[in-house]
Regions:
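Non-catalytic substrate-recognition and accessory regions of acyl/acetyltransferase enzymes
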Residues: 1-110, 114
Length: 119
């Protein structure tokens, strides 16, 4: 039997991958995922209704915390994910949508899916 060569991954997970959409208008917005910075930490705190201690996650040397933002609007964090890269898998410690992207009044849909797809 002839061995097939690995072609890589080239598929769409869902209609929202690499974008999120406004639940009111239905408009879709392209997204970026980048590393969380120390200056970002002042905004992702429990006082601002974030559920998890992202400062703690950020300080863990074996973990990387990534933020999801809308292209051309990097100052507003839509969601966060904490990842640890192992030799045989990726461990997701935490995933959280921004407070304004939760529940019945959320602004954007697709945030967790984008973060998990990135992982």
């Amino acid at each position: 039997m002839k061995k097939q060569q690995n072609q890589g991954l080239d598929f769409i997970i869902d209609k929202l991958t690499n974008s999120i959409h406004n639940v009111v208008t239905g408009d879709s917005f392209a997204t970026d995922i980048s590393l969380l910075t120390a200056s970002d930490l002042k905004n992702v705190i429990k006082k601002n209704k974030w559920q998890f201690d992202w400062r703690f996650e950020f300080k863990q040397p074996q973990r990387d915390v990534y933020k999801l933002t809308i292209v051309n609007n990097q100052s507003v964090i839509q969601g966060l994910i904490s990842l640890e890269i192992k030799s045989d898998h990726v461990y997701m410690h935490l995933v959280e949508s921004a407070p304004f992207n939760k529940g019945k009044t959320k602004v954007y849909a697709g945030v967790p899916g984008n973060l998990v797809a990135f992982a």
